[in-house]
Amino acid sequence: MGSSFGHLFRISTFGESHGGGVGVVIDGCPPRLEISEAEIQFELDRRRPGQSKITTPRKEADQCEILSGVVDGKTLDTPIAIVVRNKDQRSQDYSEMQVAYRPSHADATYDAKYGIRAVAGGGRSSARETIGRVAAGAIAKKLLREIAGVEIVGYVKRIKDLEGQIDPETVTLEQVESTIVRCPDEAIAPQMIDLIEAIGREGDSLGGVVECVARRVPRGLGEPVFDKLEADLAKACMSLPATKGFEIGSGFAGTEMTGSEHNDAFYTDEQGQIRTRTNRSGGTQGGISNGENIVIRVAFKPTATIRKEQETVTNSGEATTLAARGRHDPCVLPRAVPMVEAMVALVLCDHLLRQQAQCSWW
């Protein structure tokens, strides 16, 4: 199973949704970076369940514990192990899923591949696996800020057909966190909340889009041809549960433009830096960061596990129906924001270290 990610800044996540706990081991973090459990906890609190009326009611504090790699608040350049204990499992809610597959969930494919699966909570296919990613992402964010001043802000761009109007150049974390749906558009956010609540009462679910911007990313990050920066960002974000699409810059909308309309014209700013007047490229050209803001969008499907009765089959192929009894998000988008931010941070941190290792000699 592919549970590791990265080259120089490398993470390996572990644990199942209803096991003893989940966590991450981080290898390659440089020494003497100041980091605390409180800084990691801040990010984990943004993704934890039970945080609002529009998220899963599963009650988990998701309290992190640093087991190794940090002494007196500073990293040692040794593996950093972080664990979060599971506290609020209700495995009996998954008894029907022992034999019946959830439509559009990983149950059937895990069985087909491995011949065995952790039924309760979905095991490694559960969003609880992302706890390790978000914890590692907190460290990557801190390293990026300290070394290069990079700032990463994600937010909910769209839920179903409700789309917020947000400027990625100016949006702030405070604006994002001012509403439980994490959409900083004050006009559309209440409508999103009402829609999620209504769909949740029906036992159904919703999908949408998270947009994320990384500001002040240094030029030169990315390794053509197969490790292009946008390719690694796409892989990282598409490895998150429930993802179904990825865009950078103009994305698919760029196919409706001509070259002269789409090209980002160069100019030299007052500081003598080469810039672009527009940013349809989304901060990369030729797979390498160009110094402009990196702007990506990630599409998340509606949550597969719903209370509505659905047609399915058992693991022996017999027709049956299934209505889930577990506690699940009616919409993953509000909790997905810190997950997307974490994956962007992990990719940028890894490429920053690779760039310094490869090109800092000259």
From Swiss-Prot:
Cofactor binding summary note: Reduced FMN (FMNH(2)).
UniProt keyword NAD, yes or no: no
InterPro entries xrefs: Chorismate_synth (IPR000453), Chorismate_synth_AroC_sf (IPR035904), Chorismate_synthase_CS (IPR020541)
Molecular function as annotated in GO: chorismate synthase activity; FMN binding
This enzyme's EC code(s): 4.2.3.5
Keyword Ribonucleoprotein carried by entry: no
GO biological process: amino acid biosynthetic process; aromatic amino acid family biosynthetic process; chorismate biosynthetic process
Keywords from the named record: Amino-acid biosynthesis, Aromatic amino acid biosynthesis, FAD, Flavoprotein, FMN, Lyase, NADP
Binding residues annotated for NADP(+), in chain numbering: R47
Catalysis performed (reactions): 5-O-(1-carboxyvinyl)-3-phosphoshikimate = chorismate + phosphate
SUPFAM superfamilies, per database record: Chorismate synthase, AroC (SSF103263)
UniProt xrefs under CDD domains: Chorismate_synthase
HAMAP family: Chorismate_synth
Subunit relationships: Homotetramer.
Name by which UniProt lists this protein: Chorismate synthase
Organism this protein belongs to: Synechococcus sp. (strain ATCC 27144 / PCC 6301 / SAUG 1402/1) (Anacystis nidulans)
